[in-house]
Amino acid sequence: MKKIVLAFSGGLDTSFCIPYLIEQGYEVHTLFVNTGGISISEEKHLSNRAIQLGAKKHKNVNVETKLWDQVLVPLIFSGALYQNRYPVLCSDRYLIVSESIKLCKKLNTKYIDPIPCNFQYKPSFFSHTC
């Protein structure tokens, strides 16, 4: 069975993805990347939700320090703008994808569905390979 890493938020889109991926023949491993602002009890709730929906395993990773050191400080110093208008401070998605790829390597799988994108779930964007 092919393994896939799904970046899991517990929201509608990622909650749909777990049973859908299982139906498509994948062994689903979920990952929640905590970039700050979520309690330990909320993390536990996300873990339980992922398992209840059918995930084989769930992992929580805290990247609060990495977000500050590797993303926010350099972006603030750069003055970078998104679409020449908005400060580029919503860049935690890069850490989410990075942690997802690490888990892919640990599981020896090449399938990933990071989801943190500016679009609603569309099957044509599904299941990227590492």
Regions found by a protein language model. Name each.
Residues 1-130:
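ATP-dependent adenylation/nucleotidyltransferase module used to activate substrates
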